[in-house]
Amino acid sequence: MGRAALTAADTRVTVAGTAAGAQCLIDGDPATELLFDGSPEAVIDLVTDADMDLRNITVWPARRPIRAEAELQVKGADGYRTIASFGIDRSNPNIEVGFDPYAPVSVSVAKTTGREFRLIVRGAGKDTGFAEVLLSSLPRVERYAEKTFAKMFQSPLPYWEEYQWRDQPALDDASLAVDPAKVVDITECLDGDRLVWEAPAGEWVVMRTGMRPTGIQNSPAAPEGTGLEVDKMTPAYLQHHFDAFIGEILRRIPAEDRRTFRVVVADSYEKGGQNFTDTFLTDFRERYGYDALPFLPVYDGVVVGSQDISDRFLWDMRRLAADKLAYAHIGGLREIAHKYGLTLWLENYGHWGYPGEFLQYGGQSDEVGGEFWGEGSLGDIENRAASSCAHIYGKRKVSAESYTSAGNDFGRYPAMVKPRGDRFFSEGINNTLLHVYISQPGDELPGMNAWFGTEFNRNNTWFSNIDLFTA
C-alpha cells in the first residue's frame, strides 16, 4: 500500500503562479496558509520519492471566503491525467450556513498509484488560499462536512440536486474501512481527563467525541432577547423556550386583556443545521432498528463499514433531523400554542441551507405563508412552497410576508413593487402581510423604522392613498 499520506517529511511541494512557502500545505498546521496571487490558475505539485496508493484528497481552505474549481491529476508515462474534478465553495462564512465555516472539502478517488500529483485550482481569486492539502491512501467519506450539515449550501436558493451526492468509488480493500462490530464505547473508562482502559491486543484508534451548541443565535432580536438557538429536535427544550418568550407575555397580560392576541408567528428558517441531540442515539435506534454509536466516527469523515454504508448512515441521520424539525419542533410548537388558545402561523421554508422539507414542515402548522421582496429574486420559490403546502394539507388561506426590502430608505412606492405582488398572487398567495408596518406614536420625522422592509406607515408621503394599493 505504501505510505498512508503525503507529509512534510517526505514530500516536496511547489506552486506555480503564487508566492513561495508552499510546504506549509502539508505541515499539519491549519494556522499556516498559502494564499493565491490572483492568477487565473494555480498549479500545486506534490512530489514524493516512493509510490503511494491514493484514495482521497482533503483540502482545508484558508480562513477567508473562497469559491473555485479544482482538478487532481497524477503523472504517468504519458504525462499528467485527471483523476478527480471538484468544486470548492466556502464563499459564505456565516455559521447560519454551516457551523464549521471553513470546513474541509473531502473528495474520494478510485485507487490511483503514483508519486507525482498535481492539483490545479481555477478561479480562486486573489488572497484566497489553502491551509492544508492532504493526499491519503486511507479512504474518507466524500463531502462529509456537507453531509453532516457542518457546511450547507452557500446561497439562498439551493436546488433539489444540491443535496444529492454522487456514489463514492467502492473500496478496493475492505480492511481499510472501520468494522462497526469492532467499535467499542469506552466512555465509562474515563476518569476525569484520564482514560483508564485495559485495551485488548491490537492497534486501536481512540476517538473522543461529544455534543456542543452550533453557536448560532436567534436574530433579529433585542439584546435582552438574544441567545443561542433552541434545540430543534427535543420538545422539552422547546417548551422551555416558549415559556421564556411567549410565556412572559401570557404571564404579564391578564387573559381578559389579550383578546386580540391569537397567533404565534414562526418566521422563515435561516439558522443552519443540527445533527445531534440528547436523545439522538435512542431516537435513532427506535426509528431505524440499528445502533448509531459505531457510526459516530462518520461525522468526522471516517469510513465505517464501507463508503456506501457510511453514506446510508448519514442519510438516515439527515432524515431523522428533518422529521424532528417538522414533528418535534413545528408540531411541538403548535401543540404548545394550542394549550394557551393560540394558533401557529409559519413561513414554511428555509434559506441559506435548510435541514428540513418545506411541505412536511409546513404541514404541521395551523397556517402557512411565503415571502417576497419588492425587487430582485427573493420569493421565487418561497410562495410556491407555501401554496403547495396549503393545497396538500387543506389550508384555505395562504399568506405572504409582502414587499420586503433592504436599503433605499423611503425610496419605494406602490407602482414600483406591484409587479412582484401580481406575480405571487397568481402563484397562490391570497392574503398579504405588508412588510413592514411599525406604529408611529410620535410626530417626529421620519419616525421609527427598521433597516428592512418597505415603510408602510403614516410618515410615508403616499400612505394616505394606501387603500388604492391594498383594496
Task: Tell where the protein language model's regions lie, with residue ranges.
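Extended low-complexity, serine/threonine- and proline-enriched intrinsically disordered segments
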Residues: A4, A68-G76, P169-A177, A181
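Carbohydrate-binding surfaces of carbohydrate-active enzymes
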Residues: M1-C24, L34-D37, L46, M52-N56, ...
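Beta-sandwich interaction modules
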Residues: F86-D127
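Extracellular beta-rich ligand/substrate-recognition surface
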Residues: A31-A42, N94-P101
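Active-site-adjacent "subsite" loops/lids of carbohydrate-active enzymes
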Residues: C24, V97-Y102, F153-R252, L281-A321, ...
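Short, hydrophobic/aromatic-enriched beta-strand segments in well-ordered soluble domains
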Residues: L46, R118-G123, V206-M211
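Residue-level marker for the onset of beta-strands and adjacent loop->beta junctions
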Residues: A42-I44, A68, V105
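Exposed low-complexity, polar/acidic, P/S/T/G-rich flexible segments that act as propeptides
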Residues: L54, G114, G125-S175
